[in-house]
A protein has these predicted regions:
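Conserved catalytic core of nucleic-acid polymerases
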Residues: 18, 22, 129-154, 159, ...
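Glycine- and acidic
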Residues: 2, 21, 25-33, 214-219, ...
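Catalytic core regions of nucleotide second-messenger enzymes
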Residues: 486-493
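Structured core elements
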Residues: 17, 26, 64, 261, ...
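Function-dense linear segments that define catalytic or interfacial modules
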Residues: 248-334
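Conserved "right-hand" nucleotidyltransferase catalytic core of DNA-directed polymerases
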Residues: 1-273, 286-290, 357, 361, ...
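Flexible loop/turn segments at secondary-structure boundaries
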Residues: 72-73, 167-169, 257, 262, ...
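A common structural junction motif
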Residues: 474-486
Length: 539
């Protein structure tokens, strides 16, 4: 096993990324402005809804949604009594390593009962309040001392009774906020508890009440839109050229797994079309051109099945089993809600609500091959201090050790890196490189304009539509041959791709849905499923 092949792939990928950066992405400036105006108005609407609901939940206690401490009190109905002791108890904060860089401290470990006792004994219940005007300062927040002659001093002092706010908040017996229950020490922060969208969304499958669920959904939407406006809309506005093009910088050596990242602007974490339609602003550089996108179906799940040789994964892929429906049944949620949890166990997901943990246990039992492989990865990391992929790519874990609970440190990374690395740092680049070669060999005007994790995006010239579809299909389905040529790997997992095309990157129509299954013969032939006669000839 050698890193030479990985280095060669990286160099080939660098040439392709250079072409993509130089080609750039065309932006519809008018659509971008319309999007910004529309969602800026939506954030104003959501903020009004959130403030009204927060007032109902907290009484007269003011809540600043930009304050992590206020959000923690609102969602969890508890307030930290001593922040210094709190940080020490849960080992919250950062430390400087031997290289001088800062990193998060390793959190203290608790079982569920001990954690519950620890956080409750170090926080106080938050109650609703009733506001009244301070009688000392008459609501002005400041007072004056009376001089010996009976007149008031000109010097004004902050009122001690109301701390300068002019209002007295009197507690009543009703609990304030939404009374969420933190699950582990990882949910603790310096100000209380986590209130990020990922954490809050996990509570939507719990029995927390309709008001809490409605508020979480509204807050997560508000928070997401603010992030999207800042990251994508403002990012595009800063990077766009006078000719309405952006040229993102793609990087192979930033993420720990080797997955691509990009900046100026960030185009690797694009939101789904139904979440934030920024993709509508991406159009073809030709007046009657098209945007063509090819996606791999369940790429990381299939890669996990291949690396672990899990027979259940092979069987379900070949039969077209809907894995999200299994998740939905186990968690008693809709299929759409289930999607966020389906593949979490691939990366070591074990904690969460009761329903989530029930599903995670069922996943481990159903996909016993993946579970056994996860255990073997942990053993390999402990023994060799590194993990090696079939491609030769290595991930170092010099400080990995056993925990007192029987697991290993860096458990999530040990499970995640091989899957994400082989899928998006090995397989996807091979397809991208081969597709770029096909475009050049056919002297196409159409260009690859973007790639996002498990997809390839083409800007298609209007006269090259059919050929571009065929070449992209061929490029994406080249994984079997490319694995064999580059690494002498027999990639035996069926490959599924979906192609969509449209006038912009949002409004795409499905045009192709293929499943390719490698045969077991030494000639390495493939079975083509759902492919037209014309495409079969071209491929």
């Amino acid at each position: 096993m050698t890193l030479l092949h990985t280095a060669k792939l990286s160099m080939d990928m660098t040439r392709v990324l250079t072409d993509i950066e130089l080609s750039g992405i065309k932006i519809d400036i008018a659509a971008l402005k319309e999007l910004k105006d529309s969602y800026s108005f939506r954030t104003t609407q959501l903020l009004d809804i959130l403030n009204t609901s927060a007032a109902n939940a907290m009484g007269d206690t003011p809540i600043n949604l930009d304050s992590p401490e206020d959000r923690s009190m609102l969602f969890y109905s508890r307030k930290v009594t001593d922040k210094k002791q709190w940080a020490s108890l849960f080992n919250i904060g950062t430390t400087v390593n031997e290289r001088g860089s800062r990193r998060q401290k390793k959190r203290a470990e608790f079982n569920r009962r001990d954690f519950s006792n620890a956080y409750q004994s170090n926080t106080t219940q938050v109650h609703k309040t009733t506001a009244s005007k301070c009688t000392i300062c008459s609501g002005f927040g400041k007072t004056s001392k009376i001089k010996k002659d009976g007149t008031y001093s000109k010097v004004r002092y902050i009122c001690k009774r109301c701390s300068g706010c002019g209002i007295i908040y009197t507690k009543n017996l009703d609990t304030a906020g939404f009374s969420l229950k933190p699950l582990t020490a990882l949910d603790c922060t310096a100000h209380g508890f986590k209130t990020d969208s990922t954490t809050l969304n996990n509570y939507l499958t719990s029995d927390i009440g309709s008001n809490a669920k409605a508020y979480i959904r509204a807050y997560c939407e508000y928070s997401s839109i603010k992030t999207y406006l800042r990251t994508f809309v403002e990012g595009i506005e800063k990077a766009v050229t006078a000719k309405s093009f952006i040229h993102p910088n793609f990087m192979q050596c930033v993420t720990a797994t080797g997955r691509l990242s990009s900046r100026s602007p960030n185009f690797q974490n694009m939101p789904r079309a139904t979440t934030f339609p920024v993709r509508k602003t991406i159009i073809s550089r030709w007046e009657d051109g098209f945007i063509l996108e090819g996606d791999y179906k369940q790429l990381e799940f299939r890669v996990a099945g291949f690396l672990s040789d899990d027979k259940t994964v092979y069987k379900e892929v070949e039969e077209g089993f809907d894995v999200h429906s299994f998740t939905a049944d186990m968690m008693d949620v809709t299929r759409q809600e289930a999607k966020a949890h389906t593949f979490k166990p691939l990366y070591g997901g074990v904690s969460g609500t009761d329903k989530q943990r029930k599903y995670y246990r069922a996943f481990k039992k159903k996909y016993a091959g993946i579970t056994h492989w996860h255990d073997s990865l942990a053993e390999e990391a402990i023994a060799r201090k590194k993990l090696t992929l079939p491609s030769g790519r290595e991930y170092l874990f010099p400080n990995v050790r056993r925990t007192r609970w029987g697991g290993v440190t860096s458990g999530t990374a040990i499970k995640n890196y091989p899957v994400q690395g082989f899928a998006t740092a090995d397989l996807l680049p091979m397809a991208l490189i081969y597709t770029n070669k096909l475009l050049a060999a056919n002297k196409m005007q159409s260009v690859i304009c973007n790639t996002v994790h498990d997809s390839i995006v083409l800007d298609v010239h209007p006269e090259e539509k059919d050929l571009a579809i065929d070449l992209l299909s061929q490029g994406m389905l080249s994984l079997f041959d490319e694995c064999q040529k580059r690494y002498s790997i027999t990639y035996s997992m069926p490959v599924g791709i979906e192609l969509k095309i449209g006038k912009n990157w949002l409004d795409l129509e499905p045009i192709l849905d293929l499943e390719w299954k490698p045969q077991t013969s030494k000639e390495f032939k493939y079975e083509r499923v759902g492919i037209s006669e014309r495409q079969s000839r071209l491929l």
